[in-house]
């Protein structure tokens, strides 16, 4: 035996959400509320390898312990999200939905890594729909998305896919990536309910995009980790 790999993790999540909906004017209603979420990850990783120079340990399957950065870490996020959503039936053929969401969160780490950071995002949305005819509908959507971070990207984990690496490094400095979505959609319903033909064009403008990055310390220590690689634009038709 020349490899010992032991992982253990516990993920907990608690969410409380409340909202209230009221009619304000003819064809309009307003929903407002708030959400609070707590997410906790306790992660542990142990790696043992055969070595002629390092002393073996029974806790590592009789192999020599290998020090892994960020292997025993607790990650916790507290997130608050107040919101307001306005729906307006302008006419039998037109509708408009607007929403305003404010996200405030604190992500803290303890254990092998000690770190605490705060993030604040404003996430508006405008969704306009127009029925040109009973068969043809046009839709314009503008929305800001903020991706929720995967807590396993913060800590070191085992690598099940790369034969050249036993572990994936964690990144304690990750930031949520976000993007603006500009979407135009046309949908046509075929006669006699034979189906739907649709065309969709959208443009995404990304910020702090998340991707795997190389964090190898040398040719004999190949590692990758999740990281923010910058900005970019994507267009799809």
Task: List each language-model region with its residue ranges.
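Hydrophobic, lipid-facing positions within transmembrane beta-strands of outer-membrane proteins
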Residues: 12-18, 78-84, 122-126, 138, ...
């Amino acid at each position: 035996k020349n490899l010992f790999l032991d992982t253990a993790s516990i993920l907990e999540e608690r969410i409380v959400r409340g909202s209230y909906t009221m009619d304000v004017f003819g064809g309009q209603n307003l929903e407002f509320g708030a959400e609070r979420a707590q997410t906790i990850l306790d992660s542990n990783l142990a790696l043992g390898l055969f070595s002629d120079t390092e002393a073996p340990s029974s806790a590592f399957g009789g192999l020599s312990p290998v020090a892994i950065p960020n292997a025993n870490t607790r990650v916790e996020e507290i997130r608050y999200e107040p919101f307001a959503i306005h729906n307006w039936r302008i006419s039998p053929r037109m509708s408009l939905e607007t929403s305003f969401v404010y996200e405030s969160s604190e992500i803290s780490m303890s254990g092998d890594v000690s770190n605490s950071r705060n993030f604040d995002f404003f996430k508006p949305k405008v969704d306009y729909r127009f029925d040109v005819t009973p068969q043809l509908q046009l839709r314009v959507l503008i929305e800001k998305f903020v991706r929720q971070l995967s807590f396993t990207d913060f800590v070191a984990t085992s690598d099940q896919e790369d034969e050249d690496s036993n572990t994936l490094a964690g990144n304690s400095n990750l930031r949520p990536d976000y993007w603006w979505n500009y979407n135009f959609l046309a949908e046509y319903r075929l006669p006699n309910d034979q189906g739907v033909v649709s065309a969709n064009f959208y443009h995404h403008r990304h910020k702090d995009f998340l991707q795997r990055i190389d964090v190898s310390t040398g040719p004999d220590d190949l590692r990758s980790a999740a990281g923010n690689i910058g900005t970019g634009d994507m267009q799809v038709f």
